[in-house]
């Protein structure tokens, strides 16, 4: 569908070109922009259009359109909003999803734009109402009902006792105090979310100066705050229980109807099974599902037909007295997941979203059609950047090979050599922002047997439980490894075959040839990676069809070693080949083969020449993340998407799944029961199986289990993260209540990049013993391919001491976690300094600063962790106020029934007397202050003071 900009209202021209919200109010049947400062402020007598523009990772924009109808808006104004929304969608390219929003029945997506809630005010423009500014009049006591676990629907109800019930949460806003009444049948998550509304009311209508009280349904007059609350209603009286008719009021089964909009009328379409083939591209359809109605617009329809279908949907709702129903309008090719799920089977839809690359092609095609020379305009798109690992790559790695019911710890020289027929368990510890972090994972080779996989899962789970769930857990399959895995191993070799008894038995039973790698045999390796800290040698079939012009290869047979360089490779690829030669064949010279100039011997080893690919093996790109709350009931997984999520959406009582297509994260709250916690990996696997977003997710997609309080940065990067929030004690409701009542809000600073406090893989070791994990040969044998020992010694004096001692200098790769190795030569050193450095290289063995992967003693590691955690701490921490008001310990805990008033909830310990402080913490205040911050928080958490 093409439209002229003359058909578009001037208020809509040039919109939707940047990430964010744009809002219009309908005034005299025209859209009038609402200033940003008034976004979220709605009047009951008005209609609004809301455009949410989201910048996607592929460079394009996604547009979501909503038209909001106040309960007192006129029918004509509502119809205008509906038609203008269709017009705005056409101006944006005809891809937006359009939502009809009715006051009191808003979608969770709309409410997520205006957190914590929408509280419409009386008044309106078109209706002749006067806008009422609440802050300008005397305070009126109001009662609100709050519903929702993830976003809150707020509705004002009459200030009478009969408005209260056991199922919901109510907020009573009085002149001097705000009460939150928690119905006995309401859940913790709803109570926590309602507290966000309490905070909003406190800040908006009381300028932040107001007391807050929480009243539990069932507490009588003996409770002071409960007594005060019930006194405002004229005294306590039992609330009636919900009747059975109320319970069953929404259980009516609705019949799905399909109607075709044809020449201004609606025609019923009969069907036995709702199939995609019923929809024709040159027509519009209404899919009536009862609570919501969908309008499907074929791509071949005109703007006028789409406007007519939109008007027909509005009229149908009015005629059937269903003004509160939601209407979702979708365009062919851009249907929502919920719409597709209504059909028996929906065919795969090609990705129609335009990226910046598509746009460049369209511009070039236009210029070419006008006779212009576009040579040079259509440059190849810049190569996509390697994803950041968001993990410190200088930690300590241990690897076990699984063999039956047991596991064998591999030596440091063998831990980066994996076999495709085996399963492995790895444990990686590294320094985080404020504590040591740990990742425990399993790696399943493509040809590993089920027996070993089951054993690996069991053994890794026991290690995870032994760590008291304070580590992250990963389940990885060969060929689908995330970037974190590669930078942890740095130099990785994956060989054919396997060494486990399970694999050997499997090939014996099936009569399969054992192709396990033999050092002196025939083998071909594809070399890949992005640098010295992320490189792999993957053994492939030793045939010429395994070659690819975009890669370099190593081929060996006995003492014969070839390197093969594809025509599309880079200097970095050549560097990686040299580095991998130092690992695979360190003692033998190699013969270089350029593509197109190979020797006959090279082709003979590969069984003759044949066709091969020149396209780089594709990698899936990370998609925009989606967060889902998960409920596992009788082996059935139910999920609900959380739109425009924040850290505050992660409730301590729940399990959430974060899906970014290339990786899947399962987040487990601290308050989740042990049985459900142990099923976290099952939840991740079920999520992949159901493929809720219809992404064609692979069952081999990496799954990470993340526990609250131990979130790694490669998870927290999806949020604006405040680590203090995840370390607080108690339920999500108790935590938010402490903040709302105490008036102290945790810091909302963005997460800091983790920088290792020490250089190297294991900072506690003596530097003279350190060596790189990517070298399999002796550290004493400092060998660089093609250089004499003397030249090597001279060159080493000029090289960065933290550089790996491999064949060629590493490329200048930007590192997220740069090593902080030994002192470097000044950038402009004198000639004498250079001579002195050269001389010292010959006077004794070079003292390597390259890290070693042998684990230090527990005592040394503990000292390192504590010392490392204090580095970078502010030296200007405020002193404890010795003259602070003193409270007993019982009144300072987060679970106290009689909490101390007007305290800083982030420093509860400073209100303890010196005697009680020493008794509870087992140390003096001075000793406590000298502890690293993470250890202070852990002790406070254990004592329920955090």
Curated annotation (Swiss-Prot):
Residues 744-789, 801-832, 844-902 are annotated as: Disordered. One of its GO terms (biological process) is actin filament organization. Residues 765-777 have a biased composition (Polar residues). InterPro entries: ADF-H/Gelsolin-like_dom_sf, Gelsolin-like_dom, Gelsolin-like_dom_sf, Villin/Gelsolin, Villin_headpiece, Villin_headpiece_dom_sf. Residues 881-946 form the HP domain. SMART domains: GEL, VHP. GO terms for cellular component: actin filament bundle; cytoplasm. Belongs to the villin/gelsolin family. This is Villin-4. It comes from Oryza sativa subsp. japonica (Rice).
């Amino acid at each position: 569908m093409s439209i002229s900009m003359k058909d578009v209202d001037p208020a809509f021209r040039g919109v939707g070109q940047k990430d964010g919200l744009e809002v219009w109010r309908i005034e005299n049947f025209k859209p009038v922009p609402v200033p940003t400062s008034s976004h979220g402020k709605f009047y009951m007598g008005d209609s609004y259009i809301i455009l949410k523009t989201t910048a996607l990772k592929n460079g394009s924009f996604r547009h979501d359109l909503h038209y909001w109808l106040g309960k007192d808006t006129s029918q004509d104004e509502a119809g205008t909003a509906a038609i203008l929304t269709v017009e705005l969608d056409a101006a944006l390219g005809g891809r937006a999803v359009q939502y009809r929003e009715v006051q009191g029945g808003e979608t969770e997506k709309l409410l997520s734009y205006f957190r914590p809630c929408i509280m419409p005010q009386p008044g309106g423009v078109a209706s002749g109402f006067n806008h009422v500014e609440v802050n300008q009049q005397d305070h009126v006591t109001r009662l609100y009902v709050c519903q929702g676990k993830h976003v809150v629907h707020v509705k004002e109800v009459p200030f009478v006792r009969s408005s209260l019930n056991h199922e919901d949460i109510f907020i009573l806003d009085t002149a001097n105090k705000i009460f939150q009444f928690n119905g006995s049948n309401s859940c913790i998550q709803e109570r926590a979310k309602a507290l966000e509304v309490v905070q909003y009311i406190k800040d908006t209508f009381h300028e932040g100066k107001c007391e807050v009280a929480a009243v539990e349904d069932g507490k009588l007059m003996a409770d002071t705050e409960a007594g005060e609350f019930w006194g405002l209603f004229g005294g306590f009286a039992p609330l009636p229980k919900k009747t059975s008719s109320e319970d069953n009021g929404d259980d009516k089964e609705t019949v799905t109807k399909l109607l075709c909009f044809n020449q201004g009328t609606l025609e019923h379409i009969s069907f036995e099974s709702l199939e995609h083939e019923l929809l024709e591209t040159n027509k519009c359809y209404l899919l009536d599902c009862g609570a919501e109605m969908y309008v499907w617009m074929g791509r071949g329809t005109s703007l006028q037909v789409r406007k007519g279908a939109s008007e027909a949907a509005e009229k149908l709702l009015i005629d059937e007295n269903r003004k509160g129903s939601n209407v979702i309008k979708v365009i062919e090719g851009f249907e929502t997941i919920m719409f597709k799920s209504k059909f028996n089977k929906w065919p795969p839809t090609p990705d129609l979203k335009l990226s910046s690359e598509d746009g460049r092609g369209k511009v070039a095609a236009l210029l070419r059609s006008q006779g212009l020379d576009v040579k040079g305009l259509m440059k190849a798109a810049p190569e996509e950047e390697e994803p950041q690992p968001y993990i410190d790559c200088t930690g300590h790695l241990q690897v076990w090979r699984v063999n039956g019911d047991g596991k064998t710890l591999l030596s440091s020289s063998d831990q980066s050599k994996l076999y495709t027929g085996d399963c492995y368990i790895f444990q990686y510890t590294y320094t985080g922002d404020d504590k040591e972090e740990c990742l425990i994972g399993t790696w399943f080779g493509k040809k590993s047997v089920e027996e070993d996989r089951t054993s690996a899962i069991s053994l890794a789970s026991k290690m995870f439980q032994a760590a008291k769930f304070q580590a992250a857990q990963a389940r990885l399959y060969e060929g689908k490894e995330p970037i974190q895995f590669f930078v942890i191993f740095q130099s990785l070799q994956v060989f054919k075959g396997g060494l486990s008894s399970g694999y050997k038995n499997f090939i014996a039973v099936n009569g399969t040839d054992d192709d396990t790698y033999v050092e002196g045999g025939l083998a071909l390796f594809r070399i890949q990676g992005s640098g010295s800290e992320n490189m792999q040698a993957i053994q492939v079939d030793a045939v010429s069809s395994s070659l690819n012009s975009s890669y370099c290869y190593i081929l060996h047979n006995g003492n014969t070693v070839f390197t093969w360089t594809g025509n599309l490779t880079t200097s970095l690829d050549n560097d990686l080949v040299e580095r991998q030669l130092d690992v695979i064949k360190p003692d033998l010279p190699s013969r270089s083969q350029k593509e197109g100039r190979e020797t006959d011997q090279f082709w003979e080893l590969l069984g003759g020449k044949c066709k091969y690919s020149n396209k780089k093996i594709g990698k899936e790109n990370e998609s925009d993340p989606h967060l889902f709350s998960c409920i596992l009931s009788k082996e059935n997984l139910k999920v609900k998407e959380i739109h425009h999520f924040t850290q505050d959406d992660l409730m301590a009582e729940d399990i959430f799944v974060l899906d970014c297509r290339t990786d899947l994260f399962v987040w487990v709250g601290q308050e989740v029961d042990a049985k459900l916690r142990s099923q976290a990996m099952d939840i991740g696997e079920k999520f992949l199986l159901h493929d809720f977003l219809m992404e064609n997710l692979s069952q081999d997609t990496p799954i990470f289990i993340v526990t609250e309080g131990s979130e790694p940065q490669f998870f927290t990067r999806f949020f604006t993260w405040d680590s203090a929030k995840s370390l607080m004690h108690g339920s999500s409701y108790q935590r938010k209540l402490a903040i709302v009542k105490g008036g102290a809000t945790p810091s909302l600073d963005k997460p800091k990049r983790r920088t290792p406090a020490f250089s190297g893989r294991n900072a506690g070791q003596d530097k003279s013993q350190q060596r790189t994990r990517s070298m399999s040969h002796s550290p004493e044998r400092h060998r660089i391919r093609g250089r004499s020992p003397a030249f090597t010694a001279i060159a080493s004096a000029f090289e960065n001491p933290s550089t790996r001692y491999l064949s060629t200098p590493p490329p200048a790769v930007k590192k997220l976690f740069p090593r902080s190795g030994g002192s470097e030569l000044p950038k402009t050193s004198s000639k004498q300094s250079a001579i002195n450095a050269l001389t010292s290289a010959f006077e004794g063995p070079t003292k390597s600063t390259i890290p070693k992967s042998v684990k230090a003693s527990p005592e040394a590691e503990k000292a390192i962790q504590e010392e490392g955690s204090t580095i970078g701490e502010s030296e200007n921490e405020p002193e404890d106020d010795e003259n602070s008001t003193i409270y007993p310990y019982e009144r300072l805990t987060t679970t106290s029934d009689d909490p101390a008033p007007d305290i800083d909830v982030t420093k509860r310990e400073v209100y303890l007397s010196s005697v009680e402080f020493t008794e509870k913490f087992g140390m003096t205040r001075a000793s406590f202050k000298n502890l690293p911050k993470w250890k202070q928080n852990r002790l406070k958490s254990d004592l329920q003071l955090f």
